[in-house]
Amino acid sequence: MSFELSAPVPLSDNSEAILEKEIGETVKIEGDLVEVYEINRTVDFIKSGNYNSVALQFPDEHLADSGKVASILTNLVEANVQILADTNYGSCCVDEVAAEHMSADAIVHYGRACLSPTSRLPVLYVFGRLPINLHKLEKCLTIPLDQNILLVSDTRWYYAQDSILKSLKTLGYQNVYESHLKERIEPNLEEASTSYTIPGRTYSLPKSLSLQDMTLLYIGPDSPTLSSILMSHYSLVNQFLSFDPLSNKIVEESSFTGAKLRRRYALVQRCRDAGVIGIVIGTLGVHRYLHVLNQLRKMILNAGKKPYMLAVGKLNPAKLANFQEIECFVLIACGENSLIDSKEFYRPIVTPFELVKALSSDMSWNNDFILSFDEVLKLSEGKQSKEPSEVLTEESAEPHFSLITGKFVNSTPMRHLDVTLETADAKNNDSSSASIEKRGMRSLAVNGVYSPAAAFLQSKSWSGLDSVDEGEGPSKLYEGQSGIAKGYVGEGSKEKIQRDFGK
């Protein structure tokens, strides 16, 4: 089937398209803006902190109300109020870098949030309030009345958690325990003394109960928040239920999580087989992200692999496909943005916890899943292997059996090799550090270290149909013909025939 083109195919986008782009998803706010955006609480936050400049961070779906909210706050406080949108990474994260560019000394974050601890600026969260039908929830909940319930809510339905708690107790559920959000976060300049299983949320249970005795009831739709809590609590609780206030349906998530964890474990195996790993920076504001970056880089080097550090902003398959030599990516981001479904990507993308598992000698996994940076750092320090000088020799780099390819794989490209350099410079100066030895026209060793970048370049270079024999000398040089095609000088003569074909 063919089509006729009425105009040339555009090879580039219109530069004005981004300015004319309409926001696809806009949330219609019903009710008074002062109540919905919690203006009074925001004013108290600004005045109590004596802030001179405040950044209002809005997600795309709430940008339509940003001007009105900023105008109301400007009339109520003396601080300079500025609007912040189009964040470099996920809208659930606080964009401290953009706020500092605006010389802001505090941030008010609107909409759904991952509640990751910040490192420099104080933050006030305004989650918003979406409706919920408690009668539908009561009708859908059919678990036994003597069940222990841990109530966890999406940030946008957190306001209704007290009403939900009362409704459950009215039904006869007396053993209900709720989690609490940290709606105001101060920057963590020192190491956190307490780590929470759910980032930004706290809950307490009686000493006689453990999480294995609990049924976790999550209030909210399918979202990155649900995925992060589900992955981190799948092996900790007895049962996991989620109620979607938008569709008024309740789902038992436990039956689906096992398959998700198996897919994540397959990514860990592919990461273990990788020799070149890219560390993608997905946040610049989450507390201790630099510590995680440095620790992962050290672990990759100690494992004999090659690390590359990348900062590409918001991820998409086209960006990461430019780095073909990288075999696996690890994303350093908040707990909600780090769980990437890498089916559309050219290479697998894992979390810092999964990378630590892949690089450790003990590959056992009991379905635990860690997203907190503090917990990942503790685990990585415990899994820290020997120094590279102790393990990265060609003799000790034993291959491992890959469950993905079914073959033995040696994924330590940065191992140190004992290379004998035979170049002219090396003979004159044995200490020369710039000498390169080419082995069989296929691999390169620089300073005695195998270079994966050079090997990848060699694999992409065209070497011809026949292999080059290094011992073959140059061909003998003969004088060519002269003249025109109709008749070359000396063509057909006895002397030329004898010269070309021999006697």
UniProtKB/Swiss-Prot annotation:
Cofactor binding note of this UniProt entry: Binds 1 [4Fe-4S] cluster per subunit. The cluster facilitates the reduction of the catalytic iron-sulfur cluster in the dph1 subunit.
Pfam families recorded: Diphthamide_syn (PF01866)
Entry's Gene Ontology BP terms: protein histidyl modification to diphthamide; regulation of cytoplasmic translation
Sequence positions that bind [4Fe-4S] cluster: C93, C114, C334
Coarse class of the protein's main subcellular location: cytoplasm
Superkingdom of origin organism: Eukaryota
Cleavable signal peptide: none
Keyword Lyase attributed: no
Protein's pathway: Protein modification; peptidyl-diphthamide biosynthesis
Cofactor: [4Fe-4S] cluster
Region ranges (Disordered): 464-503
Composition bias type Basic and acidic residues, residue spans: 492-503
Localization per record: Cytoplasm
Keywords attached to this entry: Cytoplasm, Iron, Iron-sulfur, Metal-binding
Entry keyword Iron-sulfur: yes
GO cellular component: 2-(3-amino-3-carboxypropyl)histidine synthase complex; cytosol
Known function: Required for the first step of diphthamide biosynthesis, a post-translational modification of histidine which occurs in elongation factor 2. Dph1 and dph2 transfer a 3-amino-3-carboxypropyl (ACP) group from S-adenosyl-L-methionine (SAM) to a histidine residue, the reaction is assisted by a reduction system comprising dph3 and a NADH-dependent reductase, predominantly cbr1. Facilitates the reduction of the catalytic iron-sulfur cluster found in the dph1 subunit.
Assembly mode: Component of the 2-(3-amino-3-carboxypropyl)histidine synthase complex composed of dph1, dph2, dph3 and a NADH-dependent reductase, predominantly cbr1.
PANTHER family: 2-(3-AMINO-3-CARBOXYPROPYL)HISTIDINE SYNTHASE SUBUNIT 2 (PTHR10762:SF2), DIPHTHAMIDE BIOSYNTHESIS PROTEIN (PTHR10762)
UniProt record similarity statement: Belongs to the DPH1/DPH2 family. DPH2 subfamily.
Protein name: 2-(3-amino-3-carboxypropyl)histidine synthase subunit 2
Organism: Schizosaccharomyces pombe (strain 972 / ATCC 24843)
Source species taxonomy: Eukaryota, Fungi, Dikarya, Ascomycota, Taphrinomycotina
Gene: dph2
